[in-house]
Amino acid sequence: MKKVLITGAAGFLGSHLCDRFLAEGFHVVGMDNLITGNINNLSHLFPEKHFEFYHHDVSKFVHVPGDLDYILHFASPASPIDYLKMPIQTMKVGALGTHNLCGLAKAKKARLLIAST
């Protein structure tokens, strides 16, 4: 079974990607720091055998145990209001988060998709 890490998993796009990849037969690892994401977007997935969630900030070192085939990096505050309230956090997720996930992708030999606004 293929395994995918989805960052920003508790956000609008991330939560829908979690749903979709589970429906397609993937093992899904969701990751979110829950600063702007809402855990209720994922609550229906917690009973799923092939879903796991990590409450983690990707601007810090990222570790996911085991193999990893794909990384979808969707973590970021998602609106101009959030950017104004959290400019440093927004830049850290974009720069350090992307750097950390590139390192994870290299270590795991995983394919990486980076979404950005």
Model features per residue range: what roles?
Residues 1-117:
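N-terminal Rossmann-like NAD(P)+-binding domain of SDR-like oxidoreductases, especially those catalyzing
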